[in-house]
C-alpha cells in the first residue's frame, strides 16, 4: 500500500513539475485534437503553479454532444435528489433550439425548438430557466415550472432592446443582462433588425420588474458574472478598443455600479466571450482565435513580403483561466472555439464548455460560485 501510494505521489508530482516547466511555446504547436485516455490530459495546461490544485490528473476532456451550429448559453439544472445526476441545457442559436445533455443517460437530445434564437441562459434562485432571446422577439423571458413563458423585459424607455445576450441572477433576485447588437446584425442567428437604443447597455431588472440601464459605455457587452461575494460585477466588452476586455465594477447597495476597472485584456488575436466565476474568484473564460487580420510581414524573397497571421486558431481555442487579479493561470485546449461555460455535475465540479458545434466536459477541482 505504501509503495503504491508513493508511486502515485511521485507520478503526480512529476506531472505537476513537467506541466509547470513546459514552455508556453507548446501552445503554439499545431495539433490534432483527439479525446484520449492518457492521464494527465495533455490538453490541460498549467500556466501558473496556482492552477495546479484545480487540475484533476485522472480526468480528461470529453465530447458529450455535437451537431450544433453555434453552441451558447449552457445552464445546469441539478437533480431534486441530492447527489444524483442532473441535466444541462445549451442554446444552438442558428438552429433555433435548446439542446439537453442528461447526465444520467449521457444522451444529448433536442429539448425545445422555436425558442426565438435563445442565446444566454441562467437559472434563477427558484430554479426557473431565464433566457435571452436575442433575435426576432429581442427579449428576456422566464419559463415557469408549468411551462408558461413570462416576459421580463423587451424594451427600455419605450424602445425595443437590441439583442439580449448573456445573463446572471443575483442573490437578491435581481436579473442582470447584456444587450449588444449581434442578434440583429444578420440572418444567421435570427433576423436582421434595426437598433432602437442609442447605446449597447447592461441592464438590471429588480424584484418589482423595473428595468434600469446600469452600464451604458461598453460597445457590445457580452459575458457577465459576479464575484463570489457579489461585490464585483465582471462584463466582457466584445468590441473593446484596442482589444476585447473584461471590465470590473464595484456593485453598490442601491443596485448601481462604479469604479470601472479593466481586469483582463485579450491580445490582438484573442477573443473573450462568455465566462464563469468559481468559488475562489477565478474567471474561467471562453477563448478563441478572433479571425483578425493582424499579421507579421515576413520576407519571402524577391523583395516580396507575405503577411502571416500572428496566431493560429488551434493555438488559442479553448478556455483560459484567470485569477481574481486578472493573471492567466491555466488553459484548456479544445478543437473548437469556446463561447460559454457552466459548472455542473452533482458536485458542481464538472466544467461544461459550449464550443462552436459541440459540448465538452472536464472534471476539475473547483466549483462554480453559484
Task: Annotate each PLM feature.
Residues 62-65, 107-112, 150-156, 211-215, ...:
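A short beta-strand motif characteristic of beta-propeller blades
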Residues 2-18:
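N-terminal secretory signal peptides and thylakoid transit peptides that target proteins
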Residues 141-174, 178-185, 190:
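Asp-box/WD-like beta-propeller blade repeats and closely related beta-sheet repeat scaffolds
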Residues 35, 178-196, 289-312:
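Short, conserved, GDST-rich strand-edge loop motifs in beta-rich repeat architectures
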Residues 31-59:
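Blade/loop signatures of beta-propeller domains
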Residues 66-85, 114-133, 139, 157-175, ...:
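Beta-rich, blade/repeat-based domains predominating
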Residues 97-99, 139-141, 201-203, 245-247, ...:
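A short loop-to-beta-strand structural motif that recurs across blades of beta-propeller domains
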Residues 102-106, 144-147, 206-209, 252-253, ...:
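Short loop/turn segments that connect beta-strands within beta-propeller blades
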Amino acid at each position: 500500500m505504501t509503495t503504491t501510494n508513493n508511486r502515485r505521489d511521485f507520478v503526480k508530482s512529476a506531472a505537476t513539475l513537467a506541466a509547470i516547466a513546459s514552455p508556453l511555446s507548446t501552445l503554439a504547436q499545431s495539433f490534432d485534437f483527439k479525446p484520449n485516455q492518457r492521464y494527465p490530459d495533455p490538453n490541460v495546461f498549467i500556466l501558473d503553479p496556482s492552477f495546479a490544485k484545480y487540475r484533476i490528473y485522472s480526468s480528461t476532456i470529453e465530447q458529450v454532444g455535437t451537431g450544433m451550429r453555434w453552441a451558447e448559453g449552457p445552464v445546469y439544472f441539478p437533480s431534486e435528489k441530492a447527489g444524483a445526476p442532473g441535466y444541462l441545457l445549451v442554446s444552438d442559436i442558428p438552429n433555433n433550439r435548446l439542446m439537453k445533455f442528461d447526465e444520467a443517460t449521457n444522451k444529448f437530445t433536442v429539448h425545445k425548438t422555436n425558442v426565438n434564437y435563445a442565446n444566454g441562459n441562467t437559472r434563477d434562485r427558484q430554479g426557473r430557466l431565464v433566457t435571452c432571446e436575442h433575435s426576432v422577439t429581442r427579449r428576456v423571458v422566464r419559463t415557469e415550472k408549468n411551462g408558461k413563458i413570462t416576459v421580463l423585459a423587451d424594451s427600455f424607455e419605450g424602445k425595443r432592446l437590441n439583442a439580449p445576450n448573456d445573463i446572471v441572477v443575483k442573490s437578491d433576485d435581481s436579473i442582470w443582462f447584456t444587450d449588444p447588437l449581434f442578434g440583429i446584425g444578420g440572418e444567421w442567428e435570427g433576423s436582421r433588425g434595426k437598433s432602437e437604443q442609442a447605446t449597447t447597455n447592461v441592464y438590471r431588472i429588480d424584484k418589482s420588474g423595473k428595468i434600469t440601464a446600469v452600464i451604458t459605455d461598453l460597445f457590445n457587452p457580452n459575458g457577465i458574472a459576479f464575484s463570489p461575494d457579489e461585490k464585483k460585477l465582471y462584463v466582457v466588452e466584445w468590441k473593446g478598443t484596442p482589444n476585447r476586455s473584461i471590465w470590473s465594477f464595484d456593485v453598490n447597495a442601491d443596485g448601481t455600479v462604479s469604479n470601472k476597472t479593466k481586469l483582463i485584456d485579450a491580445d490582438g488575436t484573442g477573443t473573450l466571450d462568455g465566462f464563469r466565476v468559481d468559488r475562489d474568484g477565478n474567471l474561467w473564460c471562453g477563448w478563441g482565435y478572433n479571425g483578425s487580420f493582424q499579421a507579421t510581414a515576413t520576407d519571402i524573397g524577391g523583395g516580396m513580403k507575405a503577411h502571416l497571421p500572428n496566431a493560429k486558431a488551434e493555438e488559442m481555442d479553448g478556455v483560459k483561466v484567470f485569477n481574481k487579479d486578472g493573471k492567466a493561470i491555466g488553459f484548456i485546449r479544445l478543437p473548437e472555439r469556446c463561447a460559454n461555460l457552466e459548472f455542473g455535475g452533482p458536485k458542481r465540479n464538472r466544467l461544461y464548455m459550449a464550443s462552436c458545434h459541440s459540448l465538452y466536459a472536464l472534471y476539475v477541482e473547483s466549483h462554480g460560485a453559484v
